[in-house]
A protein has these predicted regions:
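Short, glycine-/small- and polar/acidic-enriched structural segments
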Residues: 37-203, 207-212, 216-220, 239, ...
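Secondary-structure end/capping motifs
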Residues: 263-349
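Second-shell loop/turn segments in exported
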Residues: 75, 171-174, 213-216, 258-260, ...
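Periplasmic-binding protein-like
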Residues: 147-157, 231-260, 267, 271
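Bacterial lipoprotein signal-peptidase II cleavage site
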Residues: 29-37
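N-terminal export and membrane-targeting signals
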Residues: 1-19
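Conserved C-terminal helix/tail region of periplasmic/extracytoplasmic solute-binding proteins
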Residues: 336-381
Length: 381
């Protein structure tokens, strides 16, 4: 898969990701007891879960799914589509849904082959564009949830470089980690930058390189490097893809198509527990970050302050940019269509993908009543 391989982190990054811990959550042998604190939920849903609990039939069906392996998209960093899953595991939400779940650290594009081969049943990818790219290359997976409906990456230039137009970057050196993010590539192209003229060089994870005269631009995460530069007092200029009308997304969950077809209630209830984990993590940010901190390898440098900033920014973007009258995690095909058309036009993703089969909206529709998650009121929440 040439496009995805080009987007992978360099070897040191992948080694660091592989050092994370495995976390296994085993479902109870019997129907979970309706104990613990909870909040009222809608009376019913299009499955065997209601405010009263989970039906014996659905619990049995979920047991039949066996162990669900979930691979994270960036070790156990407290990011959207990771922190929520970690919380769901630690808080017992998967157990409540009669699911056996095993978490393993990973990197988003490396997970495509694992999910496609059913070695991993559910995983997190970086964006809907990554889902589309995977499908364009024949991956046997489908998008089942999208948390972020905006750009998570942006571009920064040195504060003293006097760059007032992105076109000024033509022929300059740009630092990257793997490859240019989809939304940054789209922004540069929209601004008239000759991408082929850029000298793309692999750089490390320290963003202060933007102030060392070696590069003229650096893609960063809104939820990560910006904090470090601010703390250290560095000056920089931000170029946000959203200001250029770029369609973007982040934190997408995918499932193996065969597994999803064979075990639809297990996939739906995994997402149900995950979204319950998202809301708990949003309300208890310090504890959610602490859960992740216990699993993330120290060499990634994700300290408690760094983790808090990442989760606060990403969870805030998820809520702020969720389309009106749609629930958290919903896949909006109208937005996917725009993002895909943009990717094809800019030669970022191959044409020919059917977005209606690349994404499965059924699971999200089954776990919500309107915009309220169906969750048993006597289960922990």
């Amino acid at each position: 898969m040439p496009r995805l391989t080009a987007r992978r982190l360099h070897v040191l990054g992948k080694l660091a990701l592989g050092c994370g811990a495995l976390l296994t959550v085993t479902a109870p042998a019997k129907l979970p007891a309706a104990t613990g604190l909870g909040r009222p939920s809608p009376a019913s849903a299009a499955s065997g879960v209601s405010e009263k609990g989970i039906s014996a039939a659905e619990c049995t069906a979920n047991h039949r799914a066996g162990t669900i392996v979930f691979a994270t998209s960036y070790s156990y960093a407290p990011a959207a589509s990771i922190a929520d899953v970690v919380v769901a595991a630690r808080r017992g939400y998967f157990k409540d849904m009669c699911l056996d779940v095993s978490l393993q650290p990973g990197f988003s594009t490396d997970n495509v082959a694992l999910v496609s081969a059913d070695r991993v049943q559910i995983s997190s990818l970086g964006s809907d564009s990554e889902v589309l790219a995977a499908r364009a290359e024949g991956a046997n997976l489908e998008g089942v949830l999208t948390y972020g409906h905006t750009a998570i990456s942006e571009l920064i230039t040195p504060g003293d470089a006097k760059i007032t137009n992105l076109k000024q970057l033509d022929g300059t050196t740009v630092g990257i980690k793997g490859a240019l993010p989809y939304e940054v590539s789209a922004m540069l192209t929209k601004a008239g930058v000759d991408i082929a003229s850029l000298k793309l060089v692999q750089v490390g994870y320290n963003p202060v390189i933007i102030d060392q005269g070696r590069i003229m631009a650096l893609p960063v995460y809104k939820s990560n490097e910006i904090r470090e530069l601010n703390v250290l007092g560095y000056r920089y200029k931000v170029w946000d893809p959203t200001s250029y009308g770029v369609a973007a997304s982040f934190a997408s969950l995918v499932a193996n198509r065969g597994f999803a077809q064979a075990h639809p209630t297990a996939v739906a209830d995994f997402l149900r527990a995950d979204i319950a984990g998202f809301w708990w993590a949003y309300r208890h940010q310090d504890q959610a970050v602490a859960y992740c901190e216990q699993l993330v390898p120290p060499q990634l440098g994700i300290t408690r302050p760094v983790g808090r900033f990442r989760w606060r920014v990403e969870s805030g973007l998820v809520i702020r940019y969720t389309p009106t009258k749609e629930p958290i995690g919903a896949i909006d095909l109208s937005l996917v269509k725009v993002e895909y058309a943009q990717d094809v036009r800019l030669h970022l993703v191959a044409a020919g993908v059917n977005i209606h089969t690349a994404f499965n909206l059924t699971f999200i529709s089954e776990i919500y009543r309107g915009t309220t998650l169906v969750w048993p009121k006597n289960f922990a929440s």
